[in-house]
Each structure stands twice: as C-alpha cells, then as structure tokens.
Amino acid sequence: SKVKRAEKRYDIELERLRRETDERHGYMKARLSTVYSSIYGYLWKSMFRMSAQRVGILQPHPLSHKQYFSCSFEIVEPDSGIQSCKREFQFKRMAEWSNFVSRLGAEDWMIYTDIENIKDKKVYAEAHRRGVRSIFFRRLTDVDGDWIGTLYAEFFDPVTDPAIFANIKGEMERKAMLIQ
C-alpha cells in the first residue's frame, strides 16, 4: 500500500541521514582528538623545557558571551605529588573573579615572579594554597584578536634568574603561537 511504501522510504531516508551524521561525528571526533592530543603534547614539552610544575590553559565560555572560565587542559609534573587543579577550576563565574579575568582577557602577559606581588586577594589565596611561588599567564586569541583562553605556567620556586625568565617567556610565546 501507499502508506507502507512511504514508511519504507522514510525509514531508508532516516537510516541514510543517521549514517551521514555518524560519519560526520566520527570525523569530528577524530579531528578533535588530534587537536587535543597536539595541545597536550605542546603543554607537556613546555612543562619540561621551562621546568614548570604545572602548565595549562584557562578558557572562557561560552565564547559568544563569556560568563564562566574553566581549566580545559592541564599537565602536572609526574611523580611529584602535585595535585591537579583542573577539577577545581570548572565553571568559575567570571563575575566572582572579575578583576583577574578582565586582565586575562585584556593583557598579553601577566607575570608574577613572586606571588607576594599579586594584588588580587582571591588569586593570591588560590596560588598560595596550591604552593605556587611564580606564575606566568599568556593570553591566547583567535584570528580576530578576541580572547579565547590563557596559557599558564606555575612554579613552586620564585623565578628570579633573568635567563630562566627569558626562557620561560620565549617558550610560552612559541607555544601560544602553535595553540592559537
């Protein structure tokens, strides 16, 4: 009958669309997996080249009307007993960290060779609680210059040597260019 033929055509079309969607999602998953593994690779190499104890990326979201920020990627020095802070830094409301976040989005670099120089009490308390003594932030932007994230490196000793400082800054600059 006409109804059965129409249902059969509908089922065939639905199955075709399902297969197409699965293929597209499979491609996207594979592509995302490649991108994510590249980013983790860059972070891993950076951590060792800079002798950092923790390296990661903070990202605002949603990008259209930034309300939150989260630690989306993080590498921690292995076998050091250092705990990851990625789980703690998820869906932080920007309104609660407004001074810090506005600076992350506006300044290319925020560098604290000694956290005692951090004026934002909330950021200071968080860094101090985690045992951080020096922290470097490098803003990441898209092709239009809009803020899409911040690369950070944390050190458990103050960074005072100018050669080490220059090495860290150079390494972060190179990785920022690769990640953006």
Regions found by a protein language model. Give the residues of each.
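Short, solvent-exposed, Trp/other aromatic-anchored flexible loops in extracytoplasmic proteins
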Residues: 131-133, 152
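Intrinsically disordered, low-complexity terminal regulatory regions
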Residues: 1-77, 172-175, 179-180
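Short, flexible beta-strand-to-coil junctions
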Residues: 61-62, 116, 154-157
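Short loop/turn motifs at secondary-structure junctions
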Residues: 51-53, 131, 147
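Juxtadomain coupling helices with adjacent low-complexity linkers
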Residues: 147-180
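Short, solvent-exposed loop/turn segments that connect beta-strands within catalytic domains
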Residues: 63-69, 79-85, 143-147
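Regulatory sensory and allosteric helical modules in signal-transduction proteins
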Residues: 75-130
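A short, aliphatic-rich beta-strand micro-motif
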Residues: 133-142
